[in-house]
């Protein structure tokens, strides 16, 4: 999971407001003639060396993010497991076409070119110079040298004219600081003693489940996938699996994503493609969403493409950063909206919680907790299933002796992301939003094997032996693969995974409801029982919490047990 995560200093956390300035919408008018309204995209003050203003002629790709409609109805439909078609979701919940056209027209008047509206009308994307973007969004963009790289970021909150304040909630693309490139923990010498996909399936009660041939899974990746697909074919042969259909879906022109991309051939993509498809024995298809860079805007647009295409049932994202960054730049809001639509369509997204234990993943994680407390985005997304890490003590067949919380597994409570209502009986901290209007989302929701000392075997080439690798980058595709088996057994009608998991927990361990100053307050069962479909992990620590019976910030509800989970659902 981890890698070179970027860090910010002195984030501007002021809530959106209005600057009282008179004026109209004419692009010829000066910025001071508008009455500007702040969006959710706030100022970023980067910790690197500030180099001054970014070249005014530099070209940027910018997305204006529009709000969903009828948001108060979404969770009720999810809790009813009502699955809608993409057409129904767009008709009831997506922004109106007229709103998207209004935003598109504004950007065109401001000089934006190559404008497009996403299939769900959530994003209006176009190209502009820095000068045009600064004028259109009343902001300022500076350049920095950060960790040896030249990057840019907006140092002033992005705003829109008051007449567009109800159409634009955030702006993506005003910064390009990359999310950390995943760096899997591998053995210093070749190690073939790790778990095979068959052993992992056995460890998590999936061996006797039917192959997930009705379910399409997806992963997020970057670069030329030629070697990744070749390695998948080699792994299928060596591990004795049938070949699965693979589709590479580019979030933009292929040449711009593939050519000279330093992420081409990353071992992360081999892990994701091999374990998401082999743990469930087979899948209907594997979709690889290939994004140009690992910046927040690219990843957010990739998530939205997964939803707006509505081809895959499940998505795994082995990536992350300190969640306050995504909160500030608008990526958190964007993916929450996109994945809300996905949840209505019956799609689920899984994301690894990081390899820095209780700490914010600001630096290359080593599996040893260090730094200030914090959690990782996108694993803490409102509709995401965050997957933590375990140490899996089992024999080569996957017969389990014990499963412990892994010290590097990310976990904790977000001060930025709100907790979904179905999590509150398990996690009382989630109720803090009643007092602060934000925050309380805790991760992980579930967990799976991640410890590099109990690794899984991955083929990173088309010859030789597999490598033993670890990290929560393992846990996310493994868990998605397990849930793919369960979804196939239920004809893909289970709906949002995180709601399914917590509904079982809440049924087994109902909380006591008390009256609080702002409404009902849940008091969790002080002596929770194991939940059918999960292995309750009660030993181990991630440096900030200790695993215990029931829900905890190390391993969530526990690790999936596919056959039992399928029966319980």
Language-model features: locations:
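Intrinsically disordered, low-complexity acidic segments that are enriched in bulky aromatics
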Residues: 383, 392-393
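An often Trp-containing, charged/polar helix-loop segment at the C-terminal end
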Residues: 487-553
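Walker A/P-loop NTP-binding active-site region of P-loop NTPases
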Residues: 482
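Substrate-binding/charge-relay-adjacent region of secreted/lumenal peptidase catalytic domains
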Residues: 32-116, 125, 130-386, 414-471, ...
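Extended ligand-binding clefts on enzyme/binding-domain cores
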Residues: 401-405, 415
């Amino acid at each position: 999971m981890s890698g070179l995560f970027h860090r910010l200093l002195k984030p501007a956390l002021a809530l959106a407001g209005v600057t009282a300035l008179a004026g109209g919408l004419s692009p010829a008018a000066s910025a001071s003639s508008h009455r500007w309204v702040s969006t959710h995209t706030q100022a970023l003050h980067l910790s690197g060396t500030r180099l001054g203003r970014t070249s005014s002629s530099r070209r940027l790709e910018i997305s204006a993010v529009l709000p969903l409609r009828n948001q108060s109805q979404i969770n009720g439909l999810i809790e009813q497991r009502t699955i809608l078609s993409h057409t129904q979701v767009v008709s009831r919940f997506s922004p109106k076409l007229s709103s998207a056209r209004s935003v598109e027209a504004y950007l065109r008047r401001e000089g934006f070119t190559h404008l497009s509206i996403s299939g769900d009308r959530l994003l209006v994307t176009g190209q502009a110079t820095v000068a045009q973007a600064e004028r259109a969004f009343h902001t300022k963009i500076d350049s920095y040298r950060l960790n040896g790289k030249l990057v840019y970021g907006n140092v002033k909150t992005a705003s829109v004219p008051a007449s567009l304040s109800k159409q634009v909630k955030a702006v993506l693309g005003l910064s390009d600081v990359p999310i950390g490139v995943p760096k899997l923990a591998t053995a210093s010498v070749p190690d073939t003693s790790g778990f095979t996909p068959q052993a992992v399936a056995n460890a998590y009660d999936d061996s006797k489940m039917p192959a997930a041939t009705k379910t399409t899974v997806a992963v997020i990746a970057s670069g030329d996938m030629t070697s990744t697909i070749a390695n998948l074919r080699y792994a299928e042969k060596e591990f004795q699996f049938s070949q699965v259909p693979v589709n590479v879906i580019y979030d933009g022109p292929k040449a711009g994503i593939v050519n000279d991309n330093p992420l081409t051939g990353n071992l992360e993509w081999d892990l994701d493609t091999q374990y998401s498809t082999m743990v469930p024995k087979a899948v209907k298809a594997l979709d690889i969403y290939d994004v140009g860079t690992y910046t927040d805007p690219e990843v957010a647009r990739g998530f939205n493409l997964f939803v707006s295409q509505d081809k895959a049932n499940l998505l795994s994202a082995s990536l992350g950063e300190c969640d306050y960054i995504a909160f500030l730049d608008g990526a958190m809001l964007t993916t929450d909206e996109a994945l809300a639509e996905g949840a209505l369509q019956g799609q689920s997204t899984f994301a690894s919680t990081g390899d820095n234990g209780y700490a914010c993943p600001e630096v290359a994680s080593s599996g040893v907790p260090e730094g200030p407390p914090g959690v990782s985005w996108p694993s803490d997304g409102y509709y995401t299933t965050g997957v933590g890490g375990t140490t899996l003590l089992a024999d080569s067949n996957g017969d389990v002796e014990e499963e412990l919380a892994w010290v590097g597994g990310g976990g904790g409570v977000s001060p930025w992301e709100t907790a979904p209502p179905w999590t509150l009986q398990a996690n009382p901290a989630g109720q803090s939003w009643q007092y602060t209007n934000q925050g309380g989302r805790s991760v992980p929701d579930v967990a799976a094997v991640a410890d590099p000392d109990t690794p899984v075997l991955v083929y990173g080439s088309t010859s030789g032996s597999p490598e033993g690798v670890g990290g929560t980058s393992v846990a996310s595709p493994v868990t998605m693969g397990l849930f793919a088996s369960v979804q196939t057994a239920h004809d893909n009608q289970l709906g949002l995974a995180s709601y399914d998991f917590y509904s079982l927990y809440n049924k087994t361990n109902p909380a006591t409801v008390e009256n609080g100053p702002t409404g009902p307050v849940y008091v969790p069962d002080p002596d929770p029982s194991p939940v059918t479909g999960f292995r309750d992990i009660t030993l181990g620590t991630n440096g900030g919490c200790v695993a215990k019976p029931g829900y905890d910030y190390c391993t969530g509800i526990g690790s999936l047990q596919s056959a039992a989970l399928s029966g319980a659902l």
